[in-house]
């Protein structure tokens, strides 16, 4: 009886808190929070390619849609993403490396890049991930989720950060995980303290 009551109280407490859960499929931790409430920011987006790519555009479209609608993602910051055929506020582009580099002097053919309102996902990284993730055995699926959330974070007004989350050691989504984890645990989703939007 007492054990049952304690269990119920513990469940109630956990349901109110922002907690860290293990993704058993991929064997690493992601941050989860309660559903966001308040004013919803609606962002339309379209999906295109640029240059000669080896990746499949429809697969890219599907992963983008799944990532942007995932309850662990930017929806927790009250952002609702809706795909449109053209004319979106956000343009998700699977781009050849040379096209990424040509988008801005601040972009590189080695990485993905955001030049608002365009998010350029580097085709090489899309297909091969990054050394920082591959060396730890993190799946390509979770690398793709991370890079989409990171670059969309720039569109939402975020800059880069360089420190792990204090209590969990997780990498913030705005840490440049493609170039190195700086001792943090890999993480594909925005942390609770990153759930804000500016300038859109």
Model-flagged regions — what are they?
Residues 141-160:
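Active-site recognition of the HExxH zinc-binding catalytic motif
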Residues 51-54, 74, 97-101, 125-128, ...:
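Solvent-exposed loop/turn segments at secondary-structure junctions
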Residues 58-145:
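Metzincin-family zinc-dependent endopeptidase catalytic domain
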Residues 44-46, 91-93, 119-122, 155, ...:
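Structural recognition of the beta-strand scaffold that forms the well-ordered cores
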Residues 15, 39-41, 86, 113-115, ...:
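A short, polar/charged loop/turn motif at coil->beta-strand junctions and beta-hairpin connectors
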Residues 135-136, 150, 154, 166:
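Compact recognition or signaling/catalytic modules
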Residues 5-53:
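Disordered inhibitory propeptide/activation segment of secreted metzincin zinc metalloprotease zymogens
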Residues 2, 108-111, 115, 119-123, ...:
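Metalloprotease/metallohydrolase-associated module, dominated by Zn2+-dependent proteases
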């Amino acid at each position: 009886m007492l054990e049952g009551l304690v269990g119920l109280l513990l469940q109630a407490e956990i349901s109110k808190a922002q907690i860290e859960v293990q993704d058993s499929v991929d064997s690493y931790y992601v941050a989860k929070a309660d559903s966001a409430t308040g004013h919803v920011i609606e962002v339309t987006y379209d999906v295109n390619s640029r240059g000669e790519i080896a990746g499949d555009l429809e697969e890219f479209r599907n992963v983008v849609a799944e990532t942007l609608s995932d309850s662990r993602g930017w929806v927790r910051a009250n952002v609702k993403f809706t795909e449109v055929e053209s004319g979106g506020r956000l343009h998700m582009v699977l781009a050849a490396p040379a096209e990424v580099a040509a988008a801005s002097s601040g972009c590189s053919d080695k990485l993905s890049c955001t030049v608002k309102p365009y998010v350029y996902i580097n085709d090489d990284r899309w297909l091969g991930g990054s050394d920082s993730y591959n060396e730890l055995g993190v799946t390509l699926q979770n690398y793709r989720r991370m890079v989409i959330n990171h670059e969309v974070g720039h569109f939402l007004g975020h800059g880069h950060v360089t420190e792990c989350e204090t209590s969990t050691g997780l990498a913030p989504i705005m840490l440049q995980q493609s170039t190195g984890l700086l001792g943090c645990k890999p993480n594909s989703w925005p942390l609770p303290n990153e759930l804000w939007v500016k300038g859109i």
